[in-house]
Amino acid sequence: MTEQFRYTDERFADIQMLRYRLDGFEALTLRQKLYIYYLAKATLCGRDITTDQFGRYNLRIRKVLEAIYERYEGDRTTVEYKALETYLKRVWFSNGIHHHYGCEKFVPAFTEEYFRQVVDCCGCEDENIDELCKVIFDPTIQPKRVNQKAGDDLVQTSACNYYEGVTQQEAEDFYEAMRDENDPMPISYGLNTTLRKTADGMLKEDVWHEGGLYGDAIKHIIYWLEKAAEVAENELQAKIIGMLVDYYRTGDLRKFDAYSIEWLKEHEGRIDFINGFIEVYGDPLGMKASWEGIVTYKDMVATQRTQTISKNAQWFEDHSPVDPRFRKPQVVGVTANVVCSAMLGGDEYPSTAIGINLPNADWIRARYGSKSITIGNLTHAYNQAAKGNGFLQEFVADEATRALIEKYGDVCDDLHTDLHECLGHGSGQLLAGVSADALGSYGSTIEEARADLFGLYYIADAKLVELGLVPDAEAYKSQYYTYMMNGLLTQLTRIQPGNEIEEAHMRNRALIARWTLEHYPSAVRLVKHEEKTYVEVSDYEQLREAFAKLLAEIQRIKSEGDFEAAKQLVERYAIHVEPKLHEELLARYKSLGIAPVSYTHLTLPTS
């Protein structure tokens, strides 16, 4: 059965759909399956919240397109109809009209005239099609979902729907006035609100809760959460759900923090979930969270790997190559599991994370710890789908390095994710008086770089061989090579010609790889073979020295809240794309006949 399972599915635009398995699901008890079912239903209810957060016109546009898709009785074989169908699929995939990675607005391959024609044929109900046409077809209207270009007003030039009639300076001043530097347990200001300017010029927050904005969707989420609580695996799970429901009803962020602390304590059950306003990557100011949901159950065998890491978290913290002032003196509450994803929703679907570490509040991490997951059935699907596609042959110049990657690549990829989530995000501390938001729009990139560097530094450590996490002292080299290759070259195939790097994880990888290339030319360089560019690593030990040095600086920036240093690193290394190199990489990728690595996953509960 496993050999016959097909991991790849439909492909459109730059998207390759993936399928994944739910191994072990059938072995769960009926009560556990019911628990997953109810949590999954709650996960599906927040979809429209995310779509609306990503742009104020998204829901209206999606509904018109869906009406056409369902009702159109004309010729569905024409080039323009097929283009409209692809556009709709892209809207479904990205939860809106902007690319999920690059944040640029989609360019429709059908005309406005054709769109109006099919709208008329279908009798689509929207009071202002003219307005929607301007948004869809005018490239100057809402060109970017999240704009991070230095010097621009990031709020007014971003299409995301977190602010209304507000400038960047007004938003920053509004939240700065709220902060209390003497509060040891600060809430995540603005996390669950839309900030808008009223008719009289005052700034007002619309809170996302049952009785407020997004209330209809939240009521449905609450309904299914309460059903789930009735069949929870233990009393603490039921209590945690009750606390989450209380937060959803009130929108009180103190209640969200209390819920997060209790959620950290629950690790006896096999099933876990995330449901709420969590990550702030979609806000150019890094404060407001998109809605997301995921339901998981533990992979009991693979979890032994992550538990080994978490049990040794204090050793890793104590031996980190950062200034001792920035280390945690006592690591508490670090738990890590390998899980199977049973359902994804909101900002976790269709393009999803493969690892998660929560909660995000630094003071909760310091006092109570964090939970990390590596989503094993998703990483397995990625790995299986990539086999035999010619990628390594095209981008790795020598056979010895290809053999190294083929031997160790899957193991080291999973392990780096474990280290990134479990130890990287959970490591270090802010100095007293430093705000978690001190790095502003650069914060997400710096945080992801910090976690990646922690993983890169330790994946080469003899401690991992001692713990049995890697088979030998050579394994880490596969991760070092593929990381540098991705950061310098192959991740650029996800970007459209003329665009820059926008997404925080991509910026982080570019920052690390380009900084290392510049500062350690005797360890790594770009070389040409037959007019093709490759990465050549000549000294892997020096690479580790580079990662250690950069980790120390990145941690200093985070701990001290050094905005200017963060800005200089990100602006210099993380954003810009060299056009000729980009053109070459896109052509080479196209020759393979595979889509850039922008995948989705279709849940198939198959054992």
Predicted regions and their residues:
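N-terminal-proximal low-complexity accessory segments that begin disordered
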Residues: E3-K63
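Contiguous, non-catalytic segments that form substrate-binding/exosite surfaces or channel walls
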Residues: L88-A403, G409
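Long, well-structured alpha-helical subdomains associated
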Residues: R21, T50, R56, L456-I557
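Short, glycine/acidic-rich hinge or "gate" loops at secondary-structure transitions
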Residues: E235-I241, F256, V434-D437, L464-Y481
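Post-HEXXH active-site segment of zinc metalloproteases
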Residues: G428-A449
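Conserved small/polar residues in nucleotide/adenosyl-binding loops
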Residues: T600-T606
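An active-site-proximal "capping" alpha-helix that borders the catalytic cofactor pocket
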Residues: T29, S444-A460
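Active-site recognition of the HExxH zinc-binding catalytic motif
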Residues: H416-Q429
